[in-house]
Amino acid sequence: MGSVGSQRLEEPSVAGTPDPGVVMSFTFDSHQLEEAAEAAQGQGLRARGVPAFTDTTLDEPVPDDRYHAIYFAMLLAGVGFLLPYNSFITDVDYLHHKYPGTSIVFDMSLTYILVALAAVLLNNVLVERLTLHTRITAGYLLALGPLLFISICDVWLQLFSRDQAYAINLAAVGTVAFGCTVQQSSFYGYTGMLPKRYTQGVMTGESTAGVMISLSRILTKLLLPDERASTLIFFLVSVALELLCFLLHLLVRRSRFVLFYTTRPRDSHRGRPGLGRGYGYRVHHDVVAGDVHFEHPAPALAPNESPKDSPAHEVTGSGGAYMRFDVPRPRVQRSWPTFRALLLHRYVVARVIWADMLSIAVTYFITLCLFPGLESEIRHCILGEWLPILIMAVFNLSDFVGKILAALPVDWRGTHLLACSCLRVVFIPLFILCVYPSGMPALRHPAWPCIFSLLMGISNGYFGSVPMILAAGKVSPKQRELAGNTMTVSYMSGLTLGSAVAYCTYSLTRDAHGSCLHASTANGSILAGL
């Protein structure tokens, strides 16, 4: 009869029958009996004696995302795991005032990326060990703690010396990096199990975080002349937004819509979606003998025990009554997968999505070569510290637009995406011309860096989102969480290399701060600057 529990539908046997058109003996494996029966209904096979089984759990309608609430929640999830880091680097005016003559923004960027790379590698290993929501919750807590600590102890109470505060801020950025990256990597695996538009929603949320933080910094700086007070309010607003994202996640994870999609890949390991409590069975019907055998791949039987003595085996007599039952799934203790199995799972996924992995890595490598490091050091004698704030705001806003454009239904091939991502390398020499030669750059007008930042932001948002969105659809449902985590590893690899290269550009801006004699008088008011 073939091995029990196999996943193929065996051909019916017609040998030795009086009529070749009558099936006398047939065997079905696992839940494929229902699939065959459903197909048979449309062809009128029921009249020829083919048994039909139906399961009401399979007819459950797909829940609706009413009022796009789940999409909005996923957008805020994207806000939640980039908002803390953006909060640290967007108050660039406060950092330059408190730590003059230092590479604080470069140090924060490199610290964040190095810790984030380690975190995403660890999360990729633990994806089969720790539950999804455990990782996300831990990420939120690790992001909220440092934000609140720096707001109260450093910005408000100023409990530390300059050197201590410098080190503590870097440590806070490292803690935020670990928490937010575990959270980010988990969310991409999370949304990979949902329809594609929700991955795009998370990536749009990343850009929304930048836009919200840039607007928050501009408003607090305009409304509160005192730099310390404006920075404190700025950080407290960030804490409130992060807390809102966390609370919304706790609500959405229990919604019918999310549970419908996130439990399907889990159930597919057991057979068909929706049959989560069963463990599969085999049906064998011999018309000549009048027997119907139901077998289940139960644990190995004792040597002296017959298969028909197993509780997973049932026979009906010649009366023709069919029985269906599921044997409860045995409780199996979850154990660590072997190192070879981990590598094999990732290799299988990477073979399918390699072009998307390279595309997203190249996109973020080029971006991190320039943002936030080099962009934060661009100066103008009239606009002063307002210019880097405006440039970063333009980038965040255009990145937001690019990620919205990523929702357009364009059929990209992976190699074409990779080629377009590589073309963005042209932004590196263009931005260098905005700061070099030091004190008298070739493109000294403030409009140039704003235009380049606009174009770089749109292309970063688009080509940083499309590969992530498409990758999850190229693998099977049970591989989507792993594909999301693997794409995040590529994403973080690009960020890490880009941050390392960005340090090479710091020497180009080292003397730019003293090139403007009147820059300090222009920083007090945006009206005076314009």
Curated annotation (Swiss-Prot):
Keywords: Cell membrane, Glycoprotein, Membrane, Transmembrane, Transmembrane helix, Transport. Coiled coil: none annotated. Changing T220A: Reduced dopamine, serotonin and MPP(+) uptake. Residues 1-68, 123-139, 188-231, 373-381, 438-450, 510-530 are extracellular. The chain crosses the membrane at residues 69-89, 102-122, 140-160, 167-187, 232-252, 352-372, 382-402, 417-437, 451-471, 487-509. GO terms for biological process: adenosine transport; cellular detoxification; dopamine transport; dopamine uptake; epinephrine transport; epinephrine uptake; export across plasma membrane; histamine metabolic process. Pfam families: Nucleoside_tran (PF01733). Mainly expressed in brain and skeletal muscle. In brain, expressed in cerebellum, cerebral cortex, medulla oblongata, occipital pole, frontal and temporal lobes putamen, spinal cord, substancia nigra, hippocampus, caudate nucleus, nucleus accumbens, pons and choroid plexus. Expressed in heart, in both cardiomyocytes and vascular endothelial cells. Also expressed in adrenal gland, small intestine, pancreas, kidney, liver, bone marrow, lymph node. It is found in: Cell membrane; Apical cell membrane. It catalyses: serotonin(out) = serotonin(in); dopamine(out) = dopamine(in); (R)-noradrenaline(out) = (R)-noradrenaline(in); (R)-adrenaline(out) = (R)-adrenaline(in). N-glycosylated. Residues 1-21 are annotated as: Disordered. It comes from the Eukaryota. Changing E375Q: No change in adenosine uptake. Activated at acidic pH. Glycans are attached at N523. It is a multi-pass membrane protein. GO terms for cellular component: apical plasma membrane; basolateral plasma membrane; plasma membrane; presynapse. Does not interact with nucleosides, nucleobases or nucleotides, other than a moderate activity for adenosine. Mediates the uptake of neurotoxin 1-methyl-4-phenylpyridinium (MPP(+)). Electrogenic voltage-dependent transporter that mediates the transport of a variety of endogenous bioactive amines, cationic xenobiotics and drugs. Utilizes the physiologic inside-negative membrane potential as a driving force to facilitate cellular uptake of organic cations. Functions as a Na(+)- and Cl(-)-independent bidirectional transporter. Substrate transport is pH-dependent and enhanced under acidic condition, which is most likely the result of allosteric changes in the transporter structure. This is Equilibrative nucleoside transporter 4. It comes from Homo sapiens (Human). The lineage of its organism: Eukaryota, Metazoa, Chordata, Craniata, Vertebrata.
